[in-house]
Amino acid sequence: FRYRQSVDKKEINEALQKIDSYLGQTLFVENASIKPDGGLIEVQDDNAKWRIVLVSEAKHQGKDIENIEKGVLVGTKKDQDLMAAGNAIERSHKNISEIANLMLAESYFPYVLFLEGSNFLTETIQVKRPDGRIVTLEYNSGMLNRLDRLTAANYGMPINTNLCKNRFIKHEDKTIMLQAASIYTQGNGRSWESKKMFNIMFEVAETSLQMLGRDLWNQINRK
């Protein structure tokens, strides 16, 4: 196994070129790269080729819970309980797309995205201010929730689900391969426990190794 923090765009283009010479032609910045927060874990297969088994990122967006608990008001006039959600999380789409390009020849996609913060609620919560006032955060508020901006990365499939195995969809005379990120959110906006994150990442990495089974056969059966 090996761990890497980043992947060069040049390597991604080379992987695309191996599939079809028309792909991976464009590169303007020679040293361009991507750097997912959690990096990449790879295994060397029986043919000495490095194969990705896990890519992970953790993103926090929305500090409304923390601000309310501290009694901090927000907004230009400092008179609001809630701050309108931003778009910073959408940067994750770039890394997901690039790893999908790198793994286009594979039949699995072990990209895990962990989300926390008030912009990723899946349930309505109530938070108490220091003065005792209760503030309600609605999970389906267009002002707060940004989950719908990320589910494009998993084709609107379920969140909090291991989607590592690619889905092959038949439509009319075509078969379409879907590479979907596995998106996990706490739901209540709170921070992730490291053990829960580890268990999820372990499950996804295990799925990757299962998908690579025939290419790891000699190592698995080595006495």
Q: Predicted regions span which residues?
A:
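Acidic, metal/cofactor-coordinating or nucleic-acid-engaging core segments within structured domains
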Residues: 67-168
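Charged, low-complexity C-terminal accessory regions
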Residues: 130-223
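Short, conserved acidic/polar surface loops in the N-terminal third of protein domains
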Residues: 49-52, 65-69
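Short loop/turn segments at strand-loop or loop-helix junctions that form parts
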Residues: 55-63, 113-117
